[in-house]
Amino acid sequence: MMSVWFIQLAIFAQSRIIEVFPEQGKDIENIALALKKAADCKGRPVTVKFSPGIYQLDRAKSSQVLYYISNTTSELDDPDPTKHIGLYLNTLKNITIDGCGSTLLMNGEMTSFVLDKCEGIVLKNFNIDYKHPTQTEVEVLEEGNDYLIVQVHPTSQYRIVDAQLEWYGDGWSFKNGIAQSYDRISEMTWRSWSPMENLLRTVELRPNVLYLQYKEKPQVGLHTIFQMRDSFRDEVSGFVNRSKGILLENINFYYLGNFGVVCQYSENITVDRCNFAPRPGSGRTNAGFADFIQVSGCRGMIDIKNSRFIGAHDDPINIHGTHLRVIEFLSDNRLKLRFMHDQTFGFEAFFKGDDIELVDSRSLLVVGKCKVKEAKLVTPREMELTLSSPLSSEVMQQKDLVIENVTWTPEVRITNNYFARVPTRGILITTRRKSLIEGNTFYGMQMSGIFVADDGLSWYESGPVHDLTIRQNTFLNCGEPIISIDPENREYKGAVHKNITIEENYFYMRKNSSCAIRAKAVDGLMIRHNLIYSLDTEKNKESDFIQMYNCNEVTIKENRVQLHHLFK
């Protein structure tokens, strides 16, 4: 009877539609059954259509699958990287999930969706939210000499045991952790002291109103909002793995789990008209544990457009590859490699036929190139590569080498997006292929609006930029340098990046800020036709706002400086 009333298969002309209806207590089972029917179409185009409503996906009924995901958590912090998945698509093709305005409500610490080895998948027209977000929020109602009185957001669950405060939900809890502060007037956030630090005693004055006592006077302002979390990225909001031809369209990500949407070794991904921000009217000010979109080791075109990114705890968009360190030459054509950063390991980073570059991690310059004949993940931390040709003795004698997978590097377009309420950067990008950042607005980034990196000794996020245009963007009240090109080369032996154009942008400088653009180790840099609005009457020429270090073939021309009075 359930299949008749809650899942219907209809054929109109040559299209197939599988309908899903909300049913209390059975939503996750009904969705799984609809996806099974879609899989039975064997790659023929099919739409899974949700009847409008709220679908609650419970952690206890989720698909539990082990995944190692870039930039998440270490094996010490999370010995079991099993993900609890609400919407699970595995080896499926040509399927559209149309939410028709429905909400997928996660109940517990969960990964809202996974697309694994899929092709031609469209997710559109729905909302993703969490019943009890893993980031809690409180607002300061009163401050005294040794106390705060705070209002707890209704979605934040707490318990008080022996006068000690603990936040909790299904699958998670924390007592200490990390905090970020939000100011309603300036519409800005920053990393800050946490009201959980040095907390002596907690008393519940009434439901969701707490008295927090300290040894010393808390240095906070009235109506400050604290966003608190632990540091463990043991789930992600979404995971696109080894997939291609993926479209995320018109999705409201009201909350993004313990990390954002991670795209890993996938190709041709489009994000269009998506909203990464708290639900309007919810009273929440934060929408994400860390990054909103993390693109790691992808290829093809990454196209992110017409979207809003508001309320992250880290960079809203981060696009990079992964440097693995050479730890042993097994022979002249066999290498042992290691994932070096605690949060990134466990997945295949190289495949047969891939082009690779061996890189001096201190200078970030290429010392050798080759093709992969065979690749094997021997442990979650180590890979072995067999190369198609032997390496020279000169290369094998070098120390501190890392390897980038050149085949898995994407083209990028990031256009017509809005970024706000972010304590870090707006966009971090390191890819060698043609990239365009155009028509975006960045408001109140506490660090750079755009950051061009590359490193082989810290985060091990690769690689060099070879063709990047930053055009017609507006930067309002951002940290400096507003555009930062700062590869982490410890020794300068030549340019790391090349062919970067920064043109026709609008920079509205904040008070006491004097660096719009800072560039390091670039060959071929064009900075032209930008308009810099300054609060400083003594700085009135372009050279006052542009800094260069070890750059060659630089053209700086026709940039104007004007006074403004927006951010005094």
Swiss-Prot record:
Q: Which SUPFAM superfamilies match?
A: Pectin lyase-like (SSF51126)
Question: According to the record, where are the PbH1 repeats?
Answer: 87-125, 243-265, 299-321, 409-431, 432-454, 465-486
EC no. given is 3.2.1.n1, 3.2.1.22
Give one GO molecular function term: alpha-galactosidase activity
Catalysis performed (reactions): Hydrolysis of terminal, non-reducing branched (1->3)-alpha-D-galactosidic residues, producing free D-galactose; Hydrolysis of terminal, non-reducing alpha-D-galactose residues in alpha-D-galactosides, including galactose oligosaccharides, galactomannans and galactolipids
Matching Pfam families:
Beta-barrel_GLAA-B_II (PF23764), Beta_helix (PF13229)
How far does the signal peptide extend, from start to end residue?
1-17
From which domain of life does this come? Bacteria
UniProt key word Signal: yes
Listed A to Z, the keywords are: Glycosidase, Hydrolase, Repeat, Signal
- Cited InterPro entries: Beta-barrel_GLAA-B_II, Beta_helix, PbH1, Pectin_lyas_fold, Pectin_lyase_fold/virulence
Give me the disulphide-bonded residues: none
- Primary role: Alpha-galactosidase that specifically removes branched alpha-1,3-linked galactose residues present in blood group B antigens. Has no activity toward linear alpha-1,3-linked galactose residues.
The family line of this record is: Belongs to the glycosyl hydrolase 110 family. A subfamily.
Q: What is this protein called?
A: Alpha-1,3-galactosidase A
Q: Which gene encodes it?
A: glaA
